[in-house]
Amino acid sequence: MQQPTSAVPRLELRRASKSFGRVRALSDGDLALWPGEVHALLGENGAGKSTLVKILAGVHQPDTGELLVDGVARRFATPAEARDAGLAVIYQEPTLFFDLSIAENIFMGRQPVDRIGRIQYDAMRREVDGLLASLGVDLRADQLVRGLSIADQQVIEIAKALSLNANVLIMDEPTAALSLPEVERLFAIVRKLRERDVAILFITHRLDEVFALTQRVTIMRDGAKVFDGLTADLNTESIVAKMVGRDLETFYPKAERPPGEVRLAVRGLTRIGVFKDISFDVRAGEIVALAGLVGAGRSEVARAIFGIDPLDSGEIWIAGERLTAGRPAAAVRAGLALVPEDRRQQGLALELSIARNASMTVLGRLVKHGLISTRSETQLARQWGTRLHLKAGDPDAPVGTLSGGNQQKVVLGKWLATGPKVLIIDEPTRGIDVGAKAEVYGALAELVRDGMAVLMISSELPEVLGMADRVLVMHEGRISADIARADADEERIMGAALGQPVGHPVQPIPPLGHAV
């Protein structure tokens, strides 16, 4: 690990507390950021991370505690004061002016002018082009922001921070909406910033990013710091145990049981230009992971199996019965359930209650005398909420008020209420905190113990390796590898995702007759 280049931290928060009315959001906020160090800030939702960051950024003022910048006590009354002291926050969804150029966004409110007050656009463009080049990105100062990806917009925010001479960068879930290549580019930029002695606070739920990028970790729980130490001294299990406050025998509680009969069989699924000749089986009591890079066709295969997207050819069988393609209602009746990738847009009606969302797939069962029984609806929501450890006080509260992890549990409960034989779950833990991840993994393990067949689409390799009995890897619309749990590792999976041979070719799967 790179040693600190300063005798004092670049930024230090000591014993900070903050209350909102009777709610104590932060009781013991301690943090020290050193020059040239990437420091992870971890904790479940509600642990106090957001409050701590807002104190650093000047959005909130602490009730008690001390803030020091380069060893000098400071108190930021506004975000502008924090910015002037060299602090910048990069949010996962940047706030830029789409109809202005990159240069105009970076210099908004502080454009250089000549002696008679005219804006010096050439000087702006030269400086911004230099900043972008120093970050190693292919962007131009005169490009409009409209149409740029979230990843490119984050780069603009970083360049803006550097133009303001920021020496502390706070990155709040910066990779949540990025593809794998975009994440790698962001990591390369962060490493360049380290070389310039910038102190970086990196907030994430993805533990693989913590181990890949950071040198030090602070873990928060219930508004207080519970750990501060070197990343190299930690592993996944120890981080999770510190975050949730209890020992976990394993983060991935996959039950070892022999697989049963084939529950889902697909043969020769093809959608021209999207995927071709997809064939595989998923058995009762088995989790099969579908891995691959973004754009490989994984989610499209899942949507086609469920009947949302069309097929040009191929067969789908559920528990020995052939499924009529292109009809989601028939898929549900046959025993298929799909938890989609984007729970907020595709899995929930955010303005409706938790109870209504949890019962939406089985409302027909809850109708009495032509009206939906709200009592039955609430009972159903409480039943699945208890089983999935849903943290929600009032089932009548809008589901949009829940954390990401609890929203995912509602979507899962909604589909489990249909009594499926096969569960397809797309990115099961995207955007949820580590404690909620452990609970989702526990729920999946319980379903598998009860004999359910699970097809899990995931971009998180630790999740794939920890939960799957077999790993199917897709590359450019085809299955490039079928890897047993005992043979699976990150190198094999990534190699297959990139189209490289992994040692064992995919074996042809025989066609089905009238029964599986």
Swiss-Prot record:
Keywords, ordered alphabetically: ATP-binding, Cell inner membrane, Cell membrane, Membrane, Nucleotide-binding, Repeat, Sugar transport, Translocase, Transport
List of residues binding ATP: G43, E44, N45, G46, A47, G48, K49, S50
InterPro entries in UniProt: AAA+_ATPase (IPR003593), ABC_carbohydrate_import_ATPase (IPR050107), ABC_transporter-like_ATP-bd (IPR003439), ABC_transporter-like_CS (IPR017871), P-loop_NTPase (IPR027417)
Top EC group: translocase
Signal peptide residue numbers: none
Pfam families in the cross-refs: ABC_tran
Compartments, as annotated in UniProt: Cell inner membrane
Catalysed reactions listed for this entry: D-ribose(out) + ATP + H2O = D-ribose(in) + ADP + phosphate + H(+)
Metal-binding recorded as keyword: no
Annotated EC: 7.5.2.7
Assigned protein family: Belongs to the ABC transporter superfamily. Ribose importer (TC 3.A.1.2.1) family.
Name of protein: Ribose import ATP-binding protein RbsA
Organism, as annotated: Paraburkholderia xenovorans (strain LB400)
Organism ancestry: Bacteria, Pseudomonadati, Pseudomonadota, Betaproteobacteria, Burkholderiales
